[in-house]
């Protein structure tokens, strides 16, 4: 008989957790800002905005940076130029430069351990599924909550995470928030998880400085911060090591 994991549901942010987007989303931000302002922005500057919170949406972040450089540009124009670079004319943009940040074998192991895996992301769902299909990952994620389903209640609002739990409950999978973990790389991810009553694991992605990003995520309420998502199978198997003693029999 299958044994139910102590943490049955694992919800993932996509960018910076499952996917290395330093050469795609981050590059699209840089080039779109340059297109409108002629000013160069570095990865460190983008990360500083992210660390302030409230910039989980890269379209909105790009629009804000352009405005901070003194250029008033309609949001729709920013999105058009961003997507022209990121998605491309025929799925031939920077999205093709993305690489997995987690190994397929890790996802397979989590599935074998009995975890239900889901994604809660700010990506449009068509882009999220394109990436999952590209790497053969769709089978691992029966649940995906993308940008379109979040309205004006994106992270750090807990709504997308609670929506994911609601979808599972509607499918007959009754799991309380406190037995669910959200794995994300930003302060908005940690804030959303905390507000939803979920456990939170922060990830320091390759373009972030672990000496500054790890303590920031812990300060915002992450239960644990890791640099390698491939360590997750062992970590979630022993939650008392990082989530207190709430899992004692």
Would you name each region that the model predicts?
Residues 46-50, 78, 138-153:
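A short, structured active-site edge motif that brings together acidic residues
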Residues 223-231:
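Short acidic-hydrophobic, aromatic-tinged amphipathic segments that line or gate anion-handling sites
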Residues 155-190:
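Conserved Lys-Pro-Asp/Glu-containing loop-to-beta segment of HAD-superfamily phosphomonoesterases
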């Amino acid at each position: 008989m299958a044994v139910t994991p102590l943490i049955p549901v694992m919800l993932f942010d996509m960018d910076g957790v499952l996917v290395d987007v330093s050469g795609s989303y981050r590059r699209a931000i840089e080039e779109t800002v340059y297109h409108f302002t002629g000013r160069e922005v570095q990865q460190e500057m983008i990360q500083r905005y992210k660390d302030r919170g409230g910039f989980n949406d890269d379209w909105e972040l790009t629009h804000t940076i352009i405005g901070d450089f003194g250029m008033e540009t309609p949001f729709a124009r920013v999105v058009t130029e961003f997507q022209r670079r990121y998605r491309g004319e025929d799925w031939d943009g920077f999205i093709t430069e993305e690489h997995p940040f987690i190994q397929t074998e890790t996802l397979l192991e989590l599935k074998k351990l009995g975890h239900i895996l889901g994604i809660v992301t700010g990506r449009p769902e068509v882009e999220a599924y394109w990436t999952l299909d590209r790497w053969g990952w769709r089978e691992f994620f029966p649940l995906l909550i993308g940008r379109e389903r979040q309205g004006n209640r994106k992270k750090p609002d807990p709504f997308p995470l609670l929506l994911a739990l609601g979808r599972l409950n509607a499918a007959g999978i009754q799991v309380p928030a406190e037995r669910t973990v959200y794995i994300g790389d930003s302060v908005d991810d940690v804030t959303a998880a905390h507000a939803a009553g979920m456990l939170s694991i922060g990830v320091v992605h390759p373009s972030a400085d672990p000496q500054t990003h790890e303590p920031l995520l812990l300060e915002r309420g992450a239960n644990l911060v890791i640099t390698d998502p491939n360590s997750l199978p062992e970590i979630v198997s022993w939650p008392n090591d990082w989530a207190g003693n709430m899992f004692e029999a």
